[in-house]
Amino acid sequence: MKLSLLSLATLASAASLQRRSDFCGQWDTATAGDFTLYNDLWGESAGTGSQCTGVDSYSGDTIAWHTSWSWSGGSSSVKSYVNAALTFTPTQLNCISSIPTTWKWSYSGSSIVADVAYDTFLAETASGSSKYEIMVWLAALGGAGPISSTGSTIATPTIAGVNWKLYSGPNGDTTVYSFVADSTTESFSGDLNDFFTYLVDNEGVSDELYLTTLEAGTEPFTGSNAKLTVSEYSISIE
């Protein structure tokens, strides 16, 4: 079998991603195709611990990755949001037909308090500040909870075959909507655009807003010897 120079280069690139050592710096990143994997330890000063992250493989529009951590102290504070972010041109919601995604993951460790969630942002202009943050929680582990003005759900929609509790609350000037799965969902496949459509139809969110950010990762509060393994993650905007 003959391989072109491009194919050989692609294989070499994939191999280099697989061999790369984990990275542990507060703002370290790795790029894999259209994904950037962020070791975003933005809240590390709220507690004591460490977190390291690495790419396991990348092929086409699918990435596999992991992050390992131990955090203590500041039990009510998020320590990080290690995530895989898609690189794309900000796009108005009314120009998006679908956002197909698949996410398969598992967690191990002790006394884990964390979420596993998509995190997305909407703005009035392509480069403007965020008006809304939309989160989709596939898991709320150990009692982790979303931002909420009242602590109560505002709706209980069924989207992509999963039952969700919807919460809303402010984070500075940004309104946060969080869809929290009724039960831990370690294998999710659906259209993320359905969540935006729900908010447009039911919560008065404008479909003229720009989708500016698409991320998927975990927010740990506390736990020890924890490891999130993402065996498959893909997402695209159509």
UniProtKB/Swiss-Prot annotation:
<dbReference type="GO" id="GO:0005576">
    <property type="term" value="C:extracellular region"/>
</dbReference>
<dbReference type="InterPro" id="IPR002594">
    <property type="entry name" value="GH12"/>
</dbReference>
<keyword id="KW-0326">Glycosidase</keyword>
<dbReference type="GO" id="GO:0033946">
    <property type="term" value="F:xyloglucan-specific endo-beta-1,4-glucanase activity"/>
</dbReference>
<keyword id="KW-0964">Secreted</keyword>
<dbReference type="Pfam" id="PF01670">
    <property type="entry name" value="Glyco_hydro_12"/>
</dbReference>
<keyword id="KW-0378">Hydrolase</keyword>
<keyword id="KW-0961">Cell wall biogenesis/degradation</keyword>
<dbReference type="GO" id="GO:0000272">
    <property type="term" value="P:polysaccharide catabolic process"/>
</dbReference>
<keyword id="KW-0624">Polysaccharide degradation</keyword>
<keyword id="KW-0732">Signal</keyword>
<comment type="similarity">
    <text>Belongs to the glycosyl hydrolase 12 (cellulase H) family.</text>
</comment>
<comment type="function">
    <text>Catalyzes endohydrolysis of 1,4-beta-D-glucosidic linkages in xyloglucan with retention of the beta-configuration of the glycosyl residues. Specific for xyloglucan and does not hydrolyze other cell wall components.</text>
</comment>
<dbReference type="InterPro" id="IPR013320">
    <property type="entry name" value="ConA-like_dom_sf"/>
</dbReference>
<keyword id="KW-0119">Carbohydrate metabolism</keyword>
<dbReference type="InterPro" id="IPR013319">
    <property type="entry name" value="GH11/12"/>
</dbReference>
<dbReference type="GO" id="GO:0008810">
    <property type="term" value="F:cellulase activity"/>
</dbReference>
<protein>
    <recommendedName>
        <fullName>Xyloglucan-specific endo-beta-1,4-glucanase A</fullName>
        <ecNumber>3.2.1.151</ecNumber>
    </recommendedName>
</protein>
<feature type="signal peptide">
    <location>
        <begin position="1"/>
        <end position="14"/>
    </location>
</feature>
<dbReference type="GO" id="GO:0071555">
    <property type="term" value="P:cell wall organization"/>
</dbReference>
